[in-house]
């Protein structure tokens, strides 16, 4: 079974690894298509996608392609690889009909479709406080995440997970699901999506990390969803790190400092309160909340803003 894999971030790398290391289904990954290396950090040094790094670090004999677009000659390159399947996981590009026609294109999408079509389904699960998390394999068509569902898997939330932890769990679940889908592809009954039930999620931007002390639960969920990037910050760009939801009922002044101790600062919201362990001002290192407040001469009863 010849597989061309299209994927870019760490989520995709987990699934690529499962395909490469799988010994049962006679799977051969014959090519990786991934995004181009991108400038990263203050020094803007080029950083390779995690999928590419995995192949290079393990010295795998898998050709890597990083095209700007998926037109010719890339279409012919794909044809020459003679794939039985094209697997797409968080690739970051829309596949044109010329590529969809080469072989069945299976997408691993981190939601229970038709819910959360688009670029940020895992963020949306967290932000919407979903009780059930899930993942789907889908036969791709020309529209965004609208193809027939092949298989899906889900689990009941037992505890709050941040983006990294939930992504990793769903990636491993997605790897198992994909292996099942590939093995059973020709006997699976495809399930058309109910497009009337579709919901969509947008690409996350820096501005999404802006928070205020209105709703404690909402602030806490944002801290989980945006932990890696863009993180959460106040209007003065003060970052709030390691946030815990304390309660979500009582009403306080917005940003009122209720308690300061070694664990952090307890801050009141219009609804509820949160404990913040660390605070980070622009261009500064993170400080324990207690030390930051001491430096600003903020005490209980004051306002964190």
Swiss-Prot record:
This protein's GO CC annotations: cytosol
Binding site for (6S)-5,6,7,8-tetrahydrofolate: 111-114
Name of the top EC class for this enzyme: transferase
EC number, UniProt record: 2.1.2.9
CDD domains: FMT_core_Met-tRNA-FMT_N (cd08646), Met_tRNA_FMT_C (cd08704)
Gene3D superfamilies noted in UniProt: 3.40.50.12230
Gene Ontology molecular function terms on file: methionyl-tRNA formyltransferase activity
Superkingdom of the source species: Bacteria
Catalysis performed (reactions): L-methionyl-tRNA(fMet) + (6R)-10-formyltetrahydrofolate = N-formyl-L-methionyl-tRNA(fMet) + (6S)-5,6,7,8-tetrahydrofolate + H(+)
Record's keyword annotation contains DNA-binding: no
Keyword annotations: Protein biosynthesis, Transferase
Family the UniProt entry places it in: Belongs to the Fmt family.
NCBIfam families given in the database record: fmt
Role: Attaches a formyl group to the free amino group of methionyl-tRNA(fMet). The formyl group appears to play a dual role in the initiator identity of N-formylmethionyl-tRNA by promoting its recognition by IF2 and preventing the misappropriation of this tRNA by the elongation apparatus.
HAMAP family (UniProt xref): Formyl_trans (MF_00182)
Record-given protein name: Methionyl-tRNA formyltransferase
